[in-house]
Structures are given as C-alpha cells and as structure tokens.
C-alpha cells in the first residue's frame, strides 16, 4: 500500500477513535453510493453526522480541510441523502470535517462541525 494510503487509513482510524471518545455512535465506515464515499457516518442524539476525514503529514501545502472540493461536497450530500431516505431516518444531518496532521512530531486533530451546508 502506498504511504499516502496508509496515512489516510490511519487518519480514519484516529477519527473513529476520537468520535467514540466524544460519545458518537459509529454507524458506517466508508459508505459508498454511486461515485461518492462517506468516510464516517455517525450519530449523536438525533443528529446524523457525515464526516469527511482529511489527513496530511504536514500543513505546508495547506490545511487538510482545504482539500475538500465543491464536487466532492456535492457527491457527499447525494450519498447522505440516499442513506437517510433508504433508512427512512428522521434526523438532523450535519456535515463535519475531521482534519488530521500526523507526523513524527505528533498528531493534531481538528473537528470542524457544520463544515459545509447543503441545499
């Protein structure tokens, strides 16, 4: 596996651990619908959280959250709408980004709630 893929996988594992510590219930990992993949679908109270995990080894070329592009947001929204409709869920939906910088110096996790809105 390529080094960046390993870093991404480790980032997703760290994000799941982080959310569990914050008392989120993890419902799905790597949920796929059409061309979209939602890294983590979790629930806390009556809120469904779709979390996109972005992991980098350095912020040198930009913060991890800066790498979520509009097209990806459109696909995430479509996938989560499908998930909610398919499950006939009556929940509030929130889109979060979990930005992780992980390197030899340590790990920094930033949880950005309501990172973007959908219409």
From Swiss-Prot:
It holds the Pfam family UPF0102. The lineage of its organism: Bacteria, Pseudomonadati, Bacteroidota, Flavobacteriia, Flavobacteriales. Belongs to the UPF0102 family. PANTHER family: UPF0102 PROTEIN YRAN. It comes from the Bacteria. NCBIfam families: PRK12497.1-3. This is UPF0102 protein GFO_3098. SUPFAM superfamilies: Restriction endonuclease-like. Disulfide bonds: none annotated. GO terms for molecular function: nucleic acid binding.
């Amino acid at each position: 596996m390529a080094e960046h893929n390993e870093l991404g996988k480790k980032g997703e594992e760290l994000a799941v651990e982080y959310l569990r510590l914050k008392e989120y219930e993890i419902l799905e990992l790597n949920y796929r619908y059409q061309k979209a993949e939602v890294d983590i679908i979790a629930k806390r109270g009556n809120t469904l959280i779709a979390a996109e995990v972005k992991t980098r080894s350095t912020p040198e070329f930009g913060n991890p959250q800066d790498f979520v592009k509009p097209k990806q947001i459109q696909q995430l929204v479509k996938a989560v709408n499908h998930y909610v409709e398919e499950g006939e869920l009556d929940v509030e939906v929130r889109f979060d980004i979990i930005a992780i910088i992980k390197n030899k110096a340590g790990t920094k996790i930033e949880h950005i709630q309501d990172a973007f809105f959908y219409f």
